[in-house]
Amino acid sequence: MFKETLRECMEGHTLAERKAEQVMDAIMKGEATASQIASLLTVLRFRGETVAEMTGFARAMRRHSIQIEHSFSQVVDTCGTGGDDVGTFNISTATALLVSALGVPVAKHGNRAVSSKSGSADVLEALQIPIQSSPEEATASLQKHNMCFMFAPLYHVAMKHAVAPRKEIGFRTIFNLLGPLTNPARAEHQLIGVYDRNFAEKMAETLRRLGTKHSLLVAGHGGLDELSITGPSTVFEVKGDAIDRYELIPEDVGLERGDLAQIQVSTVQESATLIDQVLIGKANKSAQQIVLLNAGAALYAADRVDSIKAGVALAKEGIASGHVADHVRNLRQTDQEAEQHA
């Protein structure tokens, strides 16, 4: 089946959703060789992935993933595709910490750095915030702290068959787009950062087909996979069965434009230090405002506020009150308590 599929793709044909699901199912079961997987990823990258293919692949990945159980009806994820090559600090992780401090359950789906300076798992460790090592621990953390981190390799075990081919070919593949669409906590409210607006549009349509309550897919100025503080961002808002596209600038939500250099870092520790400063309101203006902007969008996606602007205001209040700093302190104490009992 796989050889036939490769031949069809090489000839320029696209896969129907059901066929794409079967192909990914074969990959997840270890029925495709490393060279076959690499060939498929290469063909798709150069030909361009269709929404039907992305939807079928995502359905299969979701089915093969380990999921966590929880009692929340409005879980949020702030996960991006990565790969923007801009070198910013971990904005989506800072956003997750801020939003969870405001009472919104956040199931952060992420990984270690591959091509970037710092992955979400790396920076959380640098912040001494626990990374849960099992679904049970993740559920307990989500219930107790409104925040858990789901380390992607632990939940997408079947992805092991694609790890070597992805590393060997070395370029972005469809898997970069599928990760944010396969949250193990079944988050139906998402803020997804995408490095390219064309991919953001495809992902929005894919998410609409998969089903979501309210999600924002954002592509920032200069290829940033976050809402940008330095220029306009393109937003695809998916609410139920509808998709709305619009441009957003910082001034629209009461913020000022910032400087890219102020949000760039060279190491994991620099990223962690900047996040710490943001969450106590002591960071440089650009770093402070880009987290407020993205937190405002996440709060809006979570349906906790009626607009991104209102979300920005709520995020500002949370930092100014010291509540966010207290929340981070509680998360750190959990890590220290675990070490004492180890």
UniProtKB/Swiss-Prot annotation:
> Any binding details for the cofactor?
Binds 2 magnesium ions per monomer.
Mind listing the GO molecular function terms for this protein? anthranilate phosphoribosyltransferase activity; magnesium ion binding
Which residues are listed for 5-phospho-alpha-D-ribose 1-diphosphate binding in this entry?
Answer: 80, 83-84, 88, 90-93, 108-116, 120
| Residues binding anthranilate 1, per UniProt | 80, 111
Q: How does it assemble?
A: Homodimer.
HAMAP family with a match to the protein in the record:
TrpD
Q: For this entry, list what GO says about its biological process.
A: L-tryptophan biosynthetic process
Could you list the residue ranges forming a coiled coil in this record? Answer: none
Recorded catalytic reaction(s): these are: N-(5-phospho-beta-D-ribosyl)anthranilate + diphosphate = 5-phospho-alpha-D-ribose 1-diphosphate + anthranilate
Q: Which family does it belong to?
A: Belongs to the anthranilate phosphoribosyltransferase family.
Q: Which cofactor does it need?
A: Mg(2+)
Record: residues binding Mg(2+) 1: 92, 226
A single GO cellular-component term on record: cytosol
| Annotated protein name in UniProt | Anthranilate phosphoribosyltransferase
Binding residues for anthranilate 2: 166
Q: What does the record give as its pathway?
A: Amino-acid biosynthesis; L-tryptophan biosynthesis; L-tryptophan from chorismate: step 2/5
Top EC group:
transferase
Which Enzyme Commission numbers does its entry carry?
A: 2.4.2.18
Q: Which UniProt keywords apply?
A: Amino-acid biosynthesis, Aromatic amino acid biosynthesis, Glycosyltransferase, Magnesium, Metal-binding, Transferase, Tryptophan biosynthesis
- Domain of life, per UniProt, equals Bacteria
Q: What species was this sequence derived from?
A: Halalkalibacterium halodurans (strain ATCC BAA-125 / DSM 18197 / FERM 7344 / JCM 9153 / C-125)
